[in-house]
């Protein structure tokens, strides 16, 4: 793993709320010496499973009703981040509040893993990389590497946790991705926003929605009249087989397309921005979404 893509930060801020479990999402004893804080609970869930009993892992954004794009950090978040020896930030313009908290609370030896920097992405690129199966695995490797850098005596333990997470905890996740890709590659789908693009591409689906429409919905900017007409027509004429929308960001434009899709008899699947329910592990959440998508594709195609 290229450690130069991750920033060894002198700043630290705090986040707190949810203590995530070890493999499978269950509870377990935590080591008070290594504090890990993730800005979002999808990365926090993964970190908790990789760290096991060797760290306390907390996530700042844990409420499924919270919009991470417009989140206002609290003093409690700052206190939580301040204690972090490993901080995990999404970056890519998604959680700009998090680096500010970290910079306000320096901690010698802290490692800040910024997912965007790891992946070579910048503000303006698609920030929803936890929906990219390949990039999820790169983040898994980076978290495991950083845990080992902080606690080298536990290197063998962290390697074992990483192997178990990849081969056991994520087994159903990987199997569903391969199954959907094999059965439904090339099926035309529409989607409300850019959150679905990385997963849809990995599944081999034909993404018909204009990327400018999806980006505008994700960023809360105005959708062009031309894009509205295109997306409406795709639903009305059943040019898409399935419609996928982010249930945490239902704008009037999304509501309109939802209604058009239902009227046209197009199966609908939902995704969410963060773990939903918040008690789910990363893999439970993703598997549930993949299963819903697979059912929608099966209804649409009869396969």
Per-segment meaning from a language model:
Residues 9-23:
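N-terminal export signals
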Residues 3-9:
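N-terminal export leaders
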Residues 2, 22-303:
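Extracytoplasmic metal-acquisition and chelation regions
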């Amino acid at each position: 793993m290229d450690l130069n893509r991750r920033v060894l930060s002198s700043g630290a801020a705090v986040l707190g709320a949810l203590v995530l479990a070890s493999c499978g999402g269950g509870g377990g004893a935590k080591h008070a010496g290594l504090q890990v804080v993730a800005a979002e609970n999808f990365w926090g869930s993964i970190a908790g499973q990789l760290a096991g009993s060797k760290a306390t892992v907390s996530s700042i954004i844990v409420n499924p009703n919270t919009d991470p794009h417009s989140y206002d950090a609290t003093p409690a978040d700052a206190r939580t981040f301040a204690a972090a020896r490993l901080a995990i930030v999404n970056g890519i313009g998604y959680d700009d509040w998090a680096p500010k908290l970290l910079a306000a609370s320096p901690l010698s030896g802290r490692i800040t893993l910024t997912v965007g920097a790891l992946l070579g992405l910048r503000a303006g690129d698609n920030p929803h990389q936890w929906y990219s199966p390949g990039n999820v695995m790169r983040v898994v490797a980076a978290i495991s590497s950083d845990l080992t850098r902080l606690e080298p005596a536990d290197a063998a333990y962290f390697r074992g946790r990483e192997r178990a997470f990849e081969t056991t905890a994520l087994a159903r996740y990987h199997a569903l991705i391969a199954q959907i890709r094999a059965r439904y590659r090339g099926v035309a789908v529409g989607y409300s926003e850019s959150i679905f693009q990385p997963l849809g591409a990995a599944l081999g689906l034909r993404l018909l929605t204009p990327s400018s429409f999806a980006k505008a919905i994700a960023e809360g900017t105005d959708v062009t009249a031309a894009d509205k007409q295109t997306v409406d027509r795709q639903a009305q004429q059943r040019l898409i087989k399935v419609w996928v929308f982010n249930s945490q960001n239902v704008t009037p434009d999304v509501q309109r397309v939802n209604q058009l899709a239902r009227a046209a008899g197009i199966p609908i699947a939902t995704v969410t921005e963060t773990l939903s329910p918040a008690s789910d592990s990363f893999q439970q959440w993703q598997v549930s979404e993949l299963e819903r998508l697979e059912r929608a594709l099966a209804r649409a195609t009869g396969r």
